[in-house]
Regions:
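Single, function-defining residue in the core of a domain
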Residues: 1-40, 77-79, 92, 105-107, ...
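Short, positively charged, Gly/Tyr-enriched micro-motifs
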Residues: 19-71
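Short, basic alpha-helical nucleic acid-contact segments in DNA-binding proteins
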Residues: 66-81, 85
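Short secondary-structure boundary/capping segments
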Residues: 86-87, 154
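Two-metal-ion RNase H-like nuclease active-site motif
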Residues: 93-103
């Protein structure tokens, strides 16, 4: 296999991740390359795709040592990753998606991601043992999310005011909403219908009494009661065909509730990281710190493939037709389009394979308006 693409990847990682030493950067490049080739994040499978770098067991042990290396500062690397991602973004306002995902009863991860074209780019994460109150981060859920968002915000340029979205399992608490206000970000979050809302005129109702099937309504006032009351705007919608309505709360009265649909992009990305792409669920990694390093590999690889999918929109029509049909360009995810184009370039024209990030809506997609 022509190694020019791997050499370019290694050079770019050395440039973009100055906190990594030379061998640490090379280990990250090898892991990313093996992951993309095999579409599996098991160390042994990744090693199988790197025969030119030594005997199978030699390469496997090298990847294991990288994954086990406590000197790799994942938080610092994520700062550098965020800077690289943001320098490649071509839209004005970021939408940050916060969600938790679990790998069975083994591990859980709290992740902050950047919404992009039907998917979400992992920016920063924290892993811990699943379903264990004793092993959950000591600061608790609210401070955990607050800390992750604070890190992401500090890595973004001054003056950038993102929109934060999260589901009711994370957002339904006065403490969480106050934390978001303290961060000085705009937010649009889903809350439970059991919450009580009081209008500016003093009329108080449960949200379950306010949301009506087939209707959409807005109101300004306070969510929750007494010492827990939070001022903001409520957006209620229950579209035909939905099992239940959406009860959305925001500190920005001008935000439309339809923008909350972007939160589902996070679910699609988790699917890509798992059964739809990197097979995260069969990684066999059980240590939270090792999983955080493996997630760095998956995030860099995922961002590159999304970029290739977006860059396909700038390619000539004859190149696009080699990757997907006209309908396929509309219906296939950018992740899958990027993977297809990567493999075609790798085997047909390896010299044309570029290692770059590019997060601009391609001409054949119409998601741009949702981010502006």
């Amino acid at each position: 296999m022509n190694p020019v693409g791997l050499y370019r990847l290694n050079a770019e990682i050395e440039h973009r991740f100055p906190s990594l030493g030379q061998w640490q950067a090379k280990g990250l490049a090898l892991a990313c390359w093996g992951l993309i080739i095999q579409e599996q994040c098991q160390i042994s499978r990744m090693a199988e795709s790197l025969p030119e770098w030594g005997a199978f067991n030699t390469v496997r042990q090298r990847l294991k040592r990288w994954l086990n290396n406590p000197r790799i500062n994942v938080t610092k690397a994520c700062y550098e990753w965020i800077a690289w991602v943001w320098s490649s973004c071509h839209f004005k306002r970021p939408v940050l998606l916060v969600d938790e995902s679990k790998l069975g009863d083994r591990l859980a991860v709290m992740m902050v991601s950047l919404a992009f074209e039907g998917r979400a780019i992992p920016l920063l994460w924290r892993c811990y043992y699943a379903n264990s109150a004793l092993d959950y981060p000591q600061q608790g859920q609210v401070l955990l999310i607050y800390g992750l968002l604070a890190h992401v915000l500090s890595a973004l340029p001054a003056g950038v005011r993102p929109l934060v979205q999260m589901d009711r399992g994370l957002a339904h608490s006065a403490a969480m909403l106050r934390a978001l206000k303290d961060l000085k970000v705009d937010f649009l979050v889903r809350v439970k219908a059991s919450a009580r809302f009081t209008s500016r005129r003093g009329h108080s109702q449960l949200l379950s009494q306010m949301v009506k099937y087939g209707e959409t309504s807005w109101a300004h006032g306070t969510l929750f009661t007494r010492d827990h009351a939070i001022k903001g705007s409520i957006y209620l919608t229950w579209e035909p065909g939905q099992a239940e309505g959406w009860c959305l709360f925001s500190n920005d009265p001008h935000l439309g509730g339809h923008r909350y649909a972007l939160r589902w992009w996070q679910e699609e990305s988790f699917k890509d990281l798992k059964s739809g792409g990197w097979q995260w669920q069969i990684s066999h990694v059980r240590c939270p710190q090792r999983m955080e390093r493996l997630l760095l590999v998956m995030a860099v690889s995922y961002g590159w493939m999304l970029s290739l999918g977006a860059l396909l929109g700038e390619a000539p029509a004859q190149v696009q037709r080699q990757v997907a049909t006209r309908d396929g360009l509309q219906t296939t995810s950018l992740f899958r389009l990027g993977l297809r184009w990567f493999k075609r370039l790798l085997h047909c024209t390896p010299a044309a394979l570029q290692v770059t990030l590019w997060f601009a809506p391609p001409a054949f997609r119409a998601f741009r308006c949702a981010l502006e």
